């Protein structure tokens, strides 16, 4: 058994344990393998171990991986998630190649993704990125701006609003982590009254996954714990 396969099995077991401990429905939390900077060989290894959802942060790198698997493994069942910032000049590539986008934080990007989504593809599944910590260094709309952006997305035929995503403040104690995640979970509950179709909370990474699951996360984004340390060289 490869180390990547072992890591996936270990993390999946931890997710199932956390679900049970919190009284969550079994298998209600999806594992998103963050494969940025990782070679296609590592992604293939994870895919062969049963992992089907992968997250990419960089447009060019992500598109090259999508194209590689489409060419060499045309029957693959990989679901590609874009989880990085989107520049206007790169939006077409995202619209044409990815299945999900987690980082919509302004109307201009939502409109461009809608207009540039090829008609033969299913609607792009999208999440609104919310800046729950209020840190200027983090992207995302404020909680007050979420409803206006959600209203716009709901009217765009080539986008399907699925929920919310956040990158919380970097805190190490469990209660602070839980508090951060509960903000987004509460916002999702409020949003559901107007948009009952939303079902996704993308929150939680290696260091705060357990708190995210307790707060209601439905998708955790795990990279290093699956693939090892990243190489940015």
From Swiss-Prot:
Which InterPro entries does the entry mention? Ala_racemase_N (IPR001608), PLP-binding_barrel (IPR029066), PyrdxlP_homeostasis (IPR011078)
Q: Provide this UniProt record's keywords sorted from A to Z.
A: Pyridoxal phosphate
This protein's source sits in the domain of life called Bacteria
A single Gene Ontology molecular function, please?
pyridoxal phosphate binding
Which residues belong to the signal peptide in this entry?
A: none
Q: Does the keyword Ribonucleoprotein apply?
A: no
Q: Does the keyword Flavoprotein apply?
A: no
Modified positions (N6-(pyridoxal phosphate)lysine) are 36
Listed disulfide bonds for this chain? none
What is stated as this protein's family in its record?
A: Belongs to the pyridoxal phosphate-binding protein YggS/PROSC family.
Q: What does this protein do?
A: Pyridoxal 5'-phosphate (PLP)-binding protein, which is involved in PLP homeostasis.
Query: What is the protein name stated in its UniProt record?
Result: Pyridoxal phosphate homeostasis protein
């Amino acid at each position: 058994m490869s180390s990547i396969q072992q890591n996936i099995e270990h993390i999946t077991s931890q997710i199932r344990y956390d679900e049970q401990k919190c009284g969550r429905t079994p298998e209600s939390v999806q594992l998103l393998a963050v494969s940025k900077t990782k070679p296609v060989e590592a992604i293939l290894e994870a895919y062969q171990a049963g992992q089907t959802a992968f997250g990419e942060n960089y447009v060019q790198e992500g598109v090259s991986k999508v194209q590689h698997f489409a060419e060499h493994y045309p029957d693959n069942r990989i679901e590609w998630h874009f989880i990085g910032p989107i520049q206007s000049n790169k939006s077409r590539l995202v619209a044409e190649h990815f299945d999900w986008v987690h980082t919509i934080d302004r109307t201009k990007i939502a409109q461009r993704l809608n207009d540039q989504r090829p008609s033969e593809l299913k609607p792009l599944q999208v999440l609104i990125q919310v800046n729950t910590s209020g840190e200027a260094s983090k992207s995302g709309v404020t909680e007050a701006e979420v409803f206006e952006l959600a209203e716009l997305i709901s009217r765009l035929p080539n986008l399907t609003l699925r929920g919310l995503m956040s990158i919380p403040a970097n805190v190490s104690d469990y209660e602070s982590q839980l508090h951060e995640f509960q903000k987004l979970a509460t916002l999702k509950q409020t949003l559901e009254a107007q948009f009952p179709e939303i079902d996704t909370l993308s929150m939680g990474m290696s260091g705060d996954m357990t708190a995210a699951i307790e707060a209601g996360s439905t998708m955790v984004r795990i990279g290093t714990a699956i693939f090892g340390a990243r190489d940015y060289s």
